[in-house]
UniProtKB/Swiss-Prot annotation:
Keywords: ATP-binding, Calcium, Chaperone, Endoplasmic reticulum, Glycoprotein, Nucleotide-binding, Signal. The record marks 453 as: Important for ATP hydrolysis. This is Endoplasmin homolog. It comes from Hordeum vulgare (Barley). Belongs to the heat shock protein 90 family. Residues 293-320, 774-788 have a biased composition (Acidic residues). Residues 293-329, 766-809 are annotated as: Disordered. One of its GO terms (molecular function) is ATP-dependent protein folding chaperone. May have a molecular chaperone role in the processing of secreted materials. SMART domains: HATPase_c. The keyword Signal applies.
């Protein structure tokens, strides 16, 4: 009986091997028609088919065999030309990022996550948009077709209409392209491609043909396809499996990109770049499992032949006791494997999260996948009337347009979640503009879910959240300074603490170089936190030796009896170091703060005092350096000169001439009134395109000429005035000295020609030249008319290309 069964089994196997293989036939047909447009099956023909997300590799190949091997745009599709900016951008991406092809997967997953965020938000007010069954599952699926070299990434997000496909994939905001190109030309980190909104086009690093299948609830299912050759096509999709809703991107990989068909490679990339995406990412992965199968018939027969003969009774007993013979074999199966099973970082306890996990999460959040870690972070929970969890980061670098669009940008770097549901990143009221460089997440359990963004923005809880976020943000920045050994002494630290702090050496200086302007803007805009922000200020000074110092450090070095904090504004440290306003201050060992940023002029209009110390601009009136016992006598001695000089400069707008207490080597300087503009501020305002000239004249304030009574020039002028106060030459000399002082004090000369003429007259006098010495006239020589004609003839005979070269030059 068993031998008969064995014979039947062998015959069946033989018959099966002679049958044709349908899969191979399909493959041959696909290869033969690779350059032709076939008839694609209609959607109606596929009703009842297994959902695409759950089908096996062989079913996918069979279902799509007519389209997957073709890499030409369908003849029936509506064709478009790429916008010029897009074509230029794709060339840049392909040529510049070729060595970092991995980023394409990161960008596609990031886009899929954004689409899922959008549909989840829409579902808050309309649950029907989510759909039912598999369509309602908010997840990202990655699938491989090694045979046809296709990598597919699918999401069940909001999807795209036909118009969306044209707008989002065929055109691009010029500003995004320009910013990306500028970043590339300045040697910036091109890993930041996602920040410019051009990440999708990185697919052409690995694919030479791309299909984007998308279904939006408000439109039919469409296919967008392109070979990156300057054009793309869009057609209604009647051959792919209905998506229900969402987008599937099919990348037909280049030969040199086969590594992205390896499951291990994709798993590594997801772990590296997308581990903290807020939606599950699944890979259709192969897996080996142990399976119990019946033992082969041949093995059973061999065992029978080797056994000794038994009696009929023994045989019956053995049959009753004998169990089916099985063996364990390895079997390959495919199933969906979850690649990102990490819990949202901000929901975990700060003690459970490692530095590496914080850094990875920051890179995912900021779409910045460079090597730089965030400078600092603050992870905290708030309890009470308003409960929320938050995670804030200080980026390693300032965004490329942080201050260019400071007052116009509406988008925030903070993502607002309500009960783990992403709501928006456009709530600019969560943080003030001066802290807009911070990145992070706020997740509230108090805010309502089922209201519009506009209503949510007016919710009273937001004010409480904002207040706590500001306080935590400023504490985070303060701690960044405290942990920097360049900022504070290590004397009271243990060896382990010193070692840890060495790693953060120079961190606050780096922060200040990137975001110092934001701290200054905060002092201008936020009166409530002005003192907290003032503690974060850093600057160079006359005693800092190139290092940055704080106001607290300055105060700790103030001289006994010094009541004011001295500062000077200008365009550069080098210019300020040579300023005549520092002469007496330096001689008497006073420290002076250098402010060289244009925003510093505005800053000091709001920062009037710090720790009960007033700020004093040393280029303005009111400088006090202690009592001078001889000052009264000097004023009396030079009274005739100061009165005469004031009259001599009557047309120059000088309010008064006074004895100075701030000069040592310089004969005189021009200072402004306490509330008037400094010379530096005048230049800043004059550079404004739409500045008001009448306002400038008013805000300029009074100017005072301060003279150095100990300088030989001033003493000689006093004597000359006493001898002949009506001398025109003396008046010209006095005006020249004033104009020189005006220029040395940082002001622009109102009449440079008059100043130059005065200089030339002085030079003439020093060379013993007569004031009436005339300039020698040049003899006029008439050029022969023949030469002009020759010249014209020569020009006419010049070749056209030479003339073109001249014009170009």
């Amino acid at each position: 009986m068993r031998k008969w069964a064995l014979s039947c089994a062998l015959l069946l196997v033989l018959l099966l091997t002679t049958l044709p293989d349908p899969a191979k036939k399909l493959q041959v047909n696909a290869e033969e028609s690779s350059d032709e447009v076939g008839d694609f099956p209609k959607v109606e023909e596929k009703l009842g088919a297994v959902p695409h997300g759950l089908s096996t590799d062989s079913e996918v190949v069979q279902r799509e065999s007519e389209s997957i091997s073709r890499k030409t745009l369908r003849n029936s599709a509506e064709k478009f030309e790429f916008q010029a900016e897009v074509s230029r951008l794709m060339d840049i991406i392909i040529n510049s990022l070729y060595s970092n092809k991995d980023i394409f997967l990161r960008e596609l997953i990031s886009n899929a996550s954004d689409a899922l965020d959008k549909i989840r938000f829409l579902a808050l007010t309309d649950k029907e948009v989510m759909g039912e069954g598999d369509t309602a599952k908010l997840e990202i699926q990655i699938k491989l077709d090694k045979e046809n070299k296709i990598l597919s990434i699918r999401d069940r997000g909001v999807g795209m209409t036909k118009e969306d496909l044209i707008k989002n994939l065929g055109t691009i905001a010029k500003s995004g392209t320009s910013a990306f190109v500028e970043k590339m030309q300045t040697g910036g980190d091109l890993n930041l491609i996602g920040q410019f909104g051009v990440g999708f086009y990185s697919v052409y690093l690995v694919a030479d043909y791309v299909e984007v299948v998308s279904k939006h609830n408000d439109d039919k299912q469409y296919v967008w396809e392109s070979k990156a050759d300057g054009s793309f096509a869009i057609s209604e999709d009647t051959w792919n499996e209905p998506l229900g809703r969402g987008t599937e991107i099919k990348l037909h990989l280049r030969d040199e990109a086969k590594e992205y068909l390896e499951e291990g490679k994709l798993k590594d990339l997801v772990k590296k770049y997308s581990e903290f995406i807020n939606f599950p990412i699944y890979l259709w992965a192969t897996k080996e499992v142990d399976v119990e199968v019946p033992a082969d018939e041949e093995e059973s027969n061999e065992e029978e032949e080797s056994t000794t003969e038994t009696t009929e009774e023994e045989e019956t007993e053995d049959d009753e006791e004998k169990k089916p013979k099985t063996k364990t074999v390895k079997e390959t199966t495919t199933e969906w494997e979850l690649l990102n099973d990490m819990k949202a970082v901000w929901l975990r306890s700060p003690k459970e999260v490692t530095e590496e996990e914080y850094a990875k999460f920051y890179h995912s959040l900021a779409k910045d996948f460079g090597d730089d870690k965030p400078m600092s972070w603050s992870h905290f929970s708030a309890e009470g009337d308003v409960e929320f969890k938050a995670l804030l980061f200080v980026p390693p670098k300032a965004p490329h347009d942080l201050y260019e669009s400071y007052y116009n940008a509406n988008k925030s770097n903070l993502k607002l979640y309500v009960r783990r549901v992403f709501i928006s990143d456009e709530f600019d009221d969560l943080l003030p503009k001066y802290l807009s460089f911070l990145m992070g997440i706020v997740d509230s359990d108090t805010l309502p879910l089922n209201v519009s963004r506009e209503m949510l923005q007016q919710h009273s809880s937001l004010k409480t959240i904002k207040k706590k976020l500001i306080r935590k943000a400023l504490d985070m920045i303060r701690k960044l300074a405290e942990e920097d050994p360049d900022e504070y002494s290590n004397k009271e630290k243990t060896d382990d603490e010193k070692s840890a702090m060495e790693e953060k050496k120079g961190q606050y200086a780096k922060f200040w170089n990137e975001f110092g302007k934001s701290v200054k803007l905060g002092i201008i805009e936020d009166a409530t936190n002005r003192n907290r922000l003032a503690k974060l200020l850093r600057f160079e000074s006359s005693k800092s030796d190139g290092k940055l110092v704080s106001l607290d450090e300055y105060i700790s070095r103030m001289k006994s009896g010094q009541k004011d904090i001295f500062y000077l504004t200008g365009s550069s440290k080098e210019q300020l170091e040579k300023s005549p306003f520092l002469e007496q201050l330096t001689k008497k060992n006073y420290e002076v703060i250098y402010f060289t940023d244009p925003v510093d002029e505005y800053l000091m209009q709001y920062l009037m005092d710090y720790e009960d110390k007033k700020f004093q601009n040393v280029s303005k009136e009111g400088l006090k350096l202690g009592k001078d016992s001889k000052l009264k006598d000097l004023k009396e001695s030079f009274k005739e000169l100061t009165d005469w000089w004031k009259k001599a400069l009557d047309t120059e707008g000088i309010d008064s001439v006074k004895i100075s207490n701030r000069l040592h080597n310089t004969p005189c300087v021009v200072v402004t009134s306490k509330y008037g503009w400094s010379s530096n501020m005048e230049k800043i305002m004059q550079a404004q395109t739409l500045s008001d000239a009448s306002k400038q004249a008013y805000m300029r304030g009074k100017r005072v000429l301060e003279i150095n009574p100990r300088h030989p020039i001033i003493k000689e002028l006093r004597d000359k005035v006493a001898q002949d106060s009506d001398s025109e030459g003396l008046k010209q000399t006095a005006r020249l000295v004033y104009q020189t002082a005006l220029m040395e004090s940082g002001f622009n000369l109102p009449d440079p020609k008059d100043f130059a003429s005065s200089i030339y007259r002085s030079v003439q006098k020093s060379l013993d030249l007569s004031p009436d010495a005339a300039v020698e006239e040049e003899e006029e020589v008439e050029e022969p008319e023949v030469e002009e004609k020759e010249s014209a003839k020569q020009e006419a005979e010049e070749p056209e290309h030479e003339q073109y070269d001249k014009d170009e030059l």
